[in-house]
């Protein structure tokens, strides 16, 4: 998907805005699981979630390409905090579209980060359709939830984990839109590790199926990994 040099470039962008987050092998988790268990604390990022890494890389690269017009995206929360945080750093305006009834705390955070927030529709798909329509009407750039530069940024968290913890037997990664697990696989492969990467999704895999449709619509292919 990208090269080691591109990952190094992404790392420089991320670390200009935030330090690496910690990872710890917690004794109580070892007692509960019967094995050494590490936790990567992405709650220590400026927005409390790993997705800000991808937003930082994408928005900086947009600015470097001279793409300085406003951006818009659809989200229920973490992606919607990532984009305005990163956009504000490079002087680009951002608009976020979320469903009606979205978390008030997430909405407040997105507004506080400088986004224009539009609440419409009753699910993510409706919000995304509205965001794409607004993008056309206003001449804004629509940012999908998954893309090369977003994944490049996200890969930095897995790269930090593997460099600190070494070759783990397995890593469990939650699946939403897929950037986290794809970034983890990329980091593992770049470091030449044999760690098993296991995706964890909701029962019924509704989010996973939606993720696969989004990847195919974006022009990519879904990675083959186990779902538990």
Regions found by a protein language model. Give the residues of each.
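PLP-dependent amino-acid enzyme catalytic core
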Residues: 1-228
